[in-house]
Amino acid sequence: RIRQAIEEGENILIYGDYDADGMTSASIVKESLEQLGAECRVYLPNRFTDGYGPNASVYKYFIEQEGVSLIVTVDNGVAGHEAIELAQSMGVDVIVTDHHSMPEILPDAYAIVHPEHPDADYPFKKLAGCGVAFKLACALLEEVQVELLDLVAIGTIADMVSLTDENRILVQYGLEMLGHTQRIGLQEMLDMAGIAANEVTEETVGFQIAPRLNALGRLDDPNPAIDLLTGFDDEEAHEIALMIHQKNEERKEIVQSIYEEAKTMVDPEKKVQ
């Protein structure tokens, strides 16, 4: 169905999530589809106005106003019955790629790509959303896309899935790719975090890179992250990385204020049971 959409010049919407896994997942699919010549755009929902997962109003807007005729979800979708039903009723196919817990009743999507799908026998069930997106990318391009593994490593570590089995391999090679990444946005982020590219580890991703991306999704519009991760404009990458850095500082201030407030609620004379 995706190949058909590309061949016929259809407008494809990649609908992601506002966390680091969703951002990297969407970037992976975007780059893969564009390699095949697709007309596609990415939308990451705003947690304050759109909520989590497929949003019927957003789907309707893109179908009616942007002429979208195929929607591919990444890192969400298995619980999006209402939005997917709306899209299908409007003649728009939805392909779900997700890794979250499977509901008893699955949405009536065109296809569902999920490591725990009851009709599949995929041997490793604990992929992150970006891992599932990477599998889709490899299938579409008919070869392993090693240049995408830096994004896979970030999303997998950020989502705190089990770093065993296939995830361990994806992260290992992804960290190697991060060590000499050509993504100017990641280079800017590493620079602002004071991390040399060749010193990137699981810890630096988990405690420096992932929190920055997550801060954007938690406090503001997450969509600039796509331009950061996939763009080629040095000035734009610097501006977005700086904005994300500032959002992360804001996040830390909020966390600290909550901590200080919580401390005032605790009676120091009272023993914890």
PLM region descriptions:
Residues 28, 106-157:
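Short alpha-helices
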Residues 81, 106, 127-130, 134, ...:
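Amphipathic alpha-helical transducer elements in NTP-driven molecular machines
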Residues 40, 93-96, 112-114:
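Short hydrophobic/aromatic-enriched beta-strand-loop microsegments
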